[in-house]
Amino acid sequence: TSSSDKDLTKITFCLDWTPNTNHTGLYVAQQLGYYEQAGLDVQIVQPPEDGAALMCASGQAQFAIEAQDTMAASLDSDNPLGITAVAAVLQHNTSGILSRQGDGIDTPKGMTGKTYSTWESPIELATLKTVINGDGGDFDKVNLIPNDITDEPAALAAHQTDAIWVFYGWGGINANVEKTPCDFFFFKDVNPVFDYYTPVIIANNEFLQ
């Protein structure tokens, strides 16, 4: 190890998912040496099973990527996590519902009577209930199953599920790459209130001090 390497501040940055287009800037900065120029030795890691936010809050990672809606639930609890959002990754919320083309789920009400893969997050489910019922559908008639999916287009093609919440920049583009015909609607197009910043970069509160 050179003396210059020893002078670099070691940073662990935890992703929210497998590496994808939402993380492009992190890897570009690494490849172009921007971290080193800033005096940083950044290790980018994938999240543990219990998530990036917990890893960041525990101090195992100084920074992480997290969805703002998930983060809100982590802060609004009896034991809020010691994390703070410090930057937005995208200017607009590009998340929405991906489904098989022609299944009628190109609008929220089309999810009525269909199967949706859920993380069982309170804000996730409240968002879906709002957009589905507001569009004339019935959220109570949506069949909820656990979301253990890593390849969304493949899962739809195999009829493992009917609808999945994805970021278009990854799930939607991935469907095009895999040539899987899909329908998609953005939450921000259904109601502008859902055009919040997500994902965001979060930091460990003790590290920030």
Set out the residue ranges of the language-model regions.
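N-terminal low-complexity, intrinsically disordered segments
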Residues: T180-C182
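Extended ligand-binding regions for polar small-molecule ligands
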Residues: L32-E36, Y197-Q209
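Short, glycine-/small- and polar/acidic-enriched structural segments
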Residues: D5-D148, P153-A158, D162-G169, F184-D189, ...
